[in-house]
Amino acid sequence: MAGFAELGLSSWLVEQCRQLGLKQPTPVQLGCIPAILEGRDCLGCAKTGSGKTAAFVLPILQKLSEDPYGIFCLVLTPTRELAYQIAEQFRVLGKPLGLKDCIIVGGMDMVAQALELSRKPHVVIATPGRLADHLRSSNTFSIKKIRFLVMDEADRLLEQGCTDFTVDLEAILAAVPARRQTLLFSATLTDTLRELQGLATNQPFFWEAQAPVSTVEQLDQRYLLVPEKVKDAYLVHLIQRFQDEHEDWSIIIFTNTCKTCQILCMMLRKFSFPTVALHSMMKQKERFAALAKFKSSIYRILIATDVASRGLDIPTVQVVINHNTPGLPKIYIHRVGRTARAGRQGQAITLVTQYDIHLVHAIEEQIKKKLEEFSVEEAEVLQILTQVNVVRRECEIKLEAAHFDEKKEINKRKQLILEGKDPDLEAKRKAELAKIKQKNRRFKEKVEETLKRQKAGRAGHKGRPPRTPSGSHSGPVPSQGLV
């Protein structure tokens, strides 16, 4: 099998790979690196955990070393967490170059990001929405001279679903040069990607894994048929079972909404499970902290929406539980790809209700494998059913109370927008009015206090003869007129 040197990579990059413990290139790296070094556009499709990131990072770093300038490469990714993970790969492999990178994602200060962009870093890793915001609002940087445009998890970026990046991508593509290398990488090949393969003009190279299934052999995939209304009781029973049998195992539980994610996290903590949540409603710092705590095994259970289903490399996850059956097979593939990574064993269990049978059939058809049933003792589940339902309701009430003020503020902002007003300007105006009112109130209180003191002083002088200045005479004083 060819090594990294045989792919055409420079000796310093081969040495970096050796130091990282990368001894042999993976199939996607063997297929794509030579084509990228030749200057060809590339579309690579391979299952999760196959080394797709290094397949584009290595050749880009080699080309950068030959002609270093900024901004040399733009990498687009659908999630913030994946952006930071890609940046880490660039930093580690590009350390001998003195590589400068810049991460442009939502939830962070735009002014600081604009300053970083103006310094012309070699590589920009961004989510489409935030980068498009910078392009629309700032002229302190340019991506008109980039050499590489990379779309990681390209199927998610290009699909028109609940998260539609179309408008932002149009703004970005209008700002990049026509003469560039475009690299698309994904774990799933969609119709959109097939169309792009046919439209590419820069000697396009297409590589797809030859494996007949989209999930790895080391992954034990099962389903658990449960009634919709008792799903949470089955989930608690499953986690308790894994915790009793394997205390050191790490578990990821995937949910379909931010609210469900937060409620389940609160509920499992009530049962004393070491749980942390990860979803898009959290502040960016909270998301980083949650991931760090899970990766370092401070918390053994991560409850997440699909922001954690793509690209995140957490090699020590033993179990993935789908709290809901994914609506699309590719979502299932990305979720279960968080376990059984790098040759390790892993288990994936999907909670299936009576309404999800057709979704399971679609998944089985895609992965070319039948899911086996996971058996549990129903009597044990029934014993905790009432307790789980009560705790769940308590958590729902607590969450609603905690977010009441926030929802009220959001509704106010919506109303102002409907009235043609800028919510931020209105808030600023109200703050200024409040300051003026407070200043007037303090002035009024000060005047009233002065008047009271004067009144008290006059009352103390009543009954006393008026004091006569020294050297003056008593008697009427002649009028001096108005001064």
Swiss-Prot record:
Enzyme class, UniProt record, top EC level: hydrolase
Catalytic activity: ATP + H2O = ADP + phosphate + H(+)
Residues covered by region (Disordered): 444-483
Family per record: Belongs to the DEAD box helicase family. DDX49/DBP8 subfamily.
Keyword entries, A-Z: ATP-binding, Helicase, Hydrolase, Nucleotide-binding, Nucleus, RNA-binding
Protein name according to UniProt: Probable ATP-dependent RNA helicase DDX49
Classification via Pfam families: DEAD, Helicase_C
UniProt motif Q motif: location: 2-30
Record motif DEAD box, residues: 152-155
EC numbers, comma separated: 3.6.4.13
Ranges for domain Helicase C-terminal: 218-382
GO MF annotation, one: ATP hydrolysis activity
Subcellular location: Nucleus, Nucleolus
Function, in words: ATP-dependent RNA helicase that plays a role in various aspects of RNA metabolism including the regulation of mRNA export and the levels of pre-ribosomal RNA. Regulates the stability and synthesis of pre-ribosomal RNA and thereby regulates cell proliferation. Also possesses antiviral activity by recognizing gammaherpesvirus transcripts in the context of lytic reactivation.
One record GO biological process: rRNA processing
Residues where ATP binds: 46-53
Ranges of Basic residues composition bias in the record: 453-465
Domain Helicase ATP-binding: 33-207
GO cellular component terms, semicolon-separated: nucleolus; nucleoplasm; nucleus
Organism of derivation: Homo sapiens (Human)
